[in-house]
Design a protein with these regions (language model features):
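Flexible, compositionally biased loop and terminal segments
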Residues: 1-236
Length: 236
């Protein structure tokens, strides 16, 4: 029996953020090159997006490419960029049919003109969709997100306050994550949504991202469901 059958939907996390870790290790364990792991990871994302939508999750954020990932081997970086461009183009019709709204969080500065064009065209066409919001964090870093927000706040002539910094972050219309999932068994945040996850519940899965499935997502949500979120208050 799935989570959706066990629990009331108003008790489920509205926003799940995922650090999709383990693609390279998954490939290495199978004697493949790292890029094959990224290709398999794309398939996992499609599966988890559909299941999250089925459960009634409103927002799904995924850490696809960090500002630090440019340091990886050139072939791997080029493959990730190619896969991302291909993913956006190939999934457009599915996203439109499934009423998925796609947004991209991150810096555009190092991305090619063709990739930026694809991002702008696809996200603009999906902007009015009212279903689950898929937030792909690409060329993203939590520190950069905060830094850019502070710069924008100053440029707008606004006071440096928590509210103003929050509203000037990438895609700030998305509420803070209720649940942060990291796959691959590592207990690290890796510069992901540093501002937004201040009070998020964290679940670390030992499964590598390509092996992550609906059952494991159920386990993570079950863990969230059974926690007492106090936001700094004491238990009564």
């Amino acid at each position: 029996m799935s989570i959706s059958q066990n629990y009331m939907k108003d008790k489920l996390p509205k926003h799940i953020a995922i650090i999709m870790d383990g693609n390279g290790r998954w490939a290495k364990k199978r004697g493949m090159i790292r890029t094959e792991g990224h290709k398999k990871g794309v398939e996992t994302l499609e599966k988890i997006l559909k299941y999250s939508d089925k459960l009634g999750i409103k927002y799904l954020s995924v850490y696809a490419f960090s500002t630090e990932n440019w340091k990886r081997p050139k072939l791997e970086v080029e493959t990730i960029l190619m896969l991302f461009n291909k993913y956006l183009k190939s999934k457009f019709n599915d996203f439109m049919e499934q009423n998925v709204r796609l947004v991209i969080s991150g810096s555009r500065e190092r991305l090619s003109k063709s990739l930026n064009k694809t991002i702008n065209e696809i996200t603009n066409k999906l902007e009015n969709n009212t279903g689950i919001v898929l937030n792909i964090c690409f060329n993203y870093g939590g520190r950069l997100d905060i830094l850019e927000s502070i710069k924008k706040t100053i440029e707008n002539g606004e006071d440096i306050t928590e509210d103003n910094i929050s509203k000037n972050l990438y895609n700030s219309f998305i509420p803070n994550p209720d649940l942060l999932i990291r796959t691959g068994g590592e207990f690290r945040i890796s510069n992901y949504m540093l501002w937004q996850i201040a009070y998020s519940e964290i679940y670390v899965s030992d499964l590598l991202w390509p092996d992550f499935d609906e059952k494991e997502l159920d386990k993570s949500i079950n863990s969230f469901y059974n926690r007492d979120r106090r936001y700094g208050n004491v238990e009564e």
